[in-house]
Curated annotation (Swiss-Prot):
Reaction catalysis annotation: tRNA(Lys) + L-lysine + ATP = L-lysyl-tRNA(Lys) + AMP + diphosphate
Disulfide cysteine pairs (residue numbers): none
Family annotation (Gene3D superfamilies): Bira Bifunctional Protein, Domain 2, Nucleic acid-binding proteins
Gene Ontology CC terms: cytoplasm
The protein, known as: Lysine--tRNA ligase, cytoplasmic
Gene behind the chain: KRS1
Organism: Saccharomyces cerevisiae (strain ATCC 204508 / S288c) (Baker's yeast)
Length: 591
């Protein structure tokens, strides 16, 4: 081809090219179409990808309370509530909230609801304390409400709320521990991850009834420190369901005993708690002073002498459930202030009371726990140690003196010689030979009581120990079979005494002589011995019918039925040293 033809061909080729505006290149028409089409496809992909990108996360609301320590929390919350007290928007302490159904009744009534089922027309209003609060976005909030010993879930959605504009404000005000009132409809939730869902209140309105100014202990760590639990029992009850259940069981014990006696035509009475003479038991009393009468008085150690005076007066069956006060040591099973039940029945004796005791306690255990057999862990230092206590009838019965002779392999003096000085030397020798220590004064009664402790340690299942010496029982009637002994029994469970009963001494001459013997022991230094009660002796002179008397410790019963190894667990407010005094003692010990 000539040079002229080449130039012509090149010119025609250029004339057929088109500008690619994206790159500035000159390309053929087909190439340009190809490129444009490719770019359109890529543009669509980019647009689709951009549409799929998540929206920028909205900033979460700042929780002013989230990172505060307990002291800062209290100060901040107090300021918040103080402001509401001024503005009443809302009033943080309203006078009334109408509750239409209790929390346990609510759960029971709607337990039949199926997963995801709701009843928009079924309106309820309930109340309780917030134990948990969580959010799922800004339009859905969950609460766990505690009340009457159960948990109820609250589910609050913006769409259900009575005033959408106040939704955030109302919920932001509520904190863990607050007491709230809730209105809404009923339903069962439908969790995405499976499960049956929770019977819940779908909230239409929530109202703060009482704010909690303090930070509650975290659920994860709990509220476990014993000393703090006893000092702040209110917080213990808020945080620990077991604590609440223990005191419900204690109430059931008292209710059962009261019903048992009421059904048998006993009359419940009340007798004085302050007395001129501390009588009715062998114990050291508290002394108080009556300003108007300008005289010292004793807090009662037992109601026995008053109750027997009522039987003299013709009230043949009487009982009293109440507090007693003994100025003695504090340990795992003793508190200076404690609760007993005592009853007295005319024309009954110690053997009738044995049968009543077996019946009362065995059926009480069955009714409250569902079985005659309960598990008990006596040693806090050894949680694995477990006792099986069988309350079914009949119970084992041990004759005190006969069993002591077996245990110590000696022959005891006859019952009518147990009070003599010779017997005192005999008892001292047994104590020395067996390396047993009895705190002074070494009266025969105290030394015998120490020896009987060796029998008590063998009593695991409920056991009667009977046949006590008269000198150990100044208010019990003498044995009709064995001189020097009396008609008395004690019941021991897991080595602890829970019950004491006897045929009552109704001979005024014998009673006065016994009181005088007690006075002699008091002169020997026994602070627990009784004084002569002339008022009671005078009442006996009018005639006390043959009578059986019975007493039991409510606190120890509660310990066994709640599996508590310390009496403090079953006393709402046990006796404790004040915090300030406790700190002083601690510093002295450290120094």
């Amino acid at each position: 081809m000539s040079q002229q033809d080449n130039v012509k061909a090149a010119a025609e080729g250029v004339a057929n090219l088109h500008l690619d505006e994206a790159t500035g290149e000159m390309v053929s028409k087909s190439e340009l179409k190809k490129r444009i089409k490719q770019r359109q496809v890529e543009a669509k992909k980019a647009a689709k990808k951009a549409a799929a990108q998540p929206k920028p996360a909205s900033k979460k609301k700042t929780d002013l309370f989230a990172d505060l320590d307990p002291s800062q929390y209290f100060e901040t919350r107090s300021r918040q509530i103080q402001e509401l007290r001024k503005t009443h928007e809302p009033n943080p302490y309203p006078h009334k909230f109408h509750v239409s159904i209790s929390n346990p009744e609510f759960l029971a009534k709607y337990a039949h609801l199926k997963k995801g089922e709701t009843l928009p027309e079924e309106k309820v209003s309930i109340a309780g304390r917030i134990h948990a609060k969580r959010e799922s976005g800004s339009k859905l909030k969950f609460y766990v409400l505690h009340g009457d010993g159960v948990e109820v879930q609250l589910m609050s959605q913006l769409q259900d709320y009575c005033d959408p504009d106040s939704y955030e404000k109302d919920h932001d005000l509520l904190k863990r521990g607050d007491i709230v009132g809730v209105e809404g409809y009923v339903g069962r939730t439908q969790p995405k991850k499976g499960g049956e869902g929770e019977v819940s209140v779908f909230v239409s309105r929530v109202q703060l009834l009482t704010p909690c100014l303090h930070m509650l202990p975290a659920d994860h760590f709990g509220f476990k420190d014993q000393e703090t639990r006893y000092r702040k029992r209110y917080l213990d009850l808020i945080m620990n369901k077991d604590a609440r259940n223990r005191f419900i069981t204690r109430s059931e014990i008292i209710r059962y005993i009261r019903r048992f006696l009421d059904q048998r035509k006993f009359i419940e009475v009340e007798t004085p708690m302050m007395n001129v003479i501390a009588g009715g038991a062998t114990a050291k009393p508290f002394i108080t002073h009556h300003n108007d009468l300008d005289m010292d008085m004793y807090m009662r150690i037992a109601p026995e002498l008053f109750l027997k005076q009522l039987v003299v007066g013709g009230l043949d069956r009487v009982y009293e459930i109440g507090r007693q006060f003994r100025n003695e040591g504090i340990d795992m099973t003793h508190n200076p202030e404690f609760t007993t039940c005592e009853f007295y029945q005319a024309y009954a004796d110690v053997y009738d009371l044995m049968d009543m005791t077996e019946l009362m306690f065995s059926e009480m255990v069955k009714e409250i726990t569902g079985s005659y057999i309960i598990k008990y862990h006596p040693d806090p230092a050894d949680p694995a140690k477990e006792l099986e206590l069988n309350f079914s009838r009949p119970w084992k019965r041990i004759n005190m003196i006969e069993e002591l002779e077996k245990v110590f392999n000696v022959k005891f003096p006859s019952g009518d010689q147990l009070h003599t000085a010779e017997t005192g030397e005999f008892l001292k020798k047994i104590l020395v030979d067996n390396k047993l220590e009895c705190p002074p004064p070494l009266t025969n009664a105290r030394m015998l009581d120490k020896l009987v402790g060796e029998l008590e340690d063998t009593c695991i299942n409920p056991t009667f120990i009977f046949g006590h010496p008269q000198m150990m029982s100044p208010l019990a009637k003498y044995s009709r079979d064995q001189p020097g002994l009396c008609e008395r029994f004690e019941v021991f469970v897991a080595t602890k005494e829970i019950c004491n009963a006897y045929t009552e001494l109704n001979d005024p001459f014998d009673q006065r002589a016994r009181f005088e013997e007690q006075a002699r022991q008091k002169d020997q230094g026994d602070d627990e011995a009784q004084l002569v009660d002339e008022t009671f002796c005078n009442a006996l002179e009018y005639g006390l019918p043959p009578t059986g008397g019975w007493g039991c410790g409510i606190d120890r019963l509660a310990m066994f039925l709640t599996d508590s190894n310390t009496i403090r667990e079953v006393l709402l407010f046990p006796t404790l040293k004040p915090d300030v005094l406790r700190e002083e003692v601690k510093k002295e010990e450290e120094n």
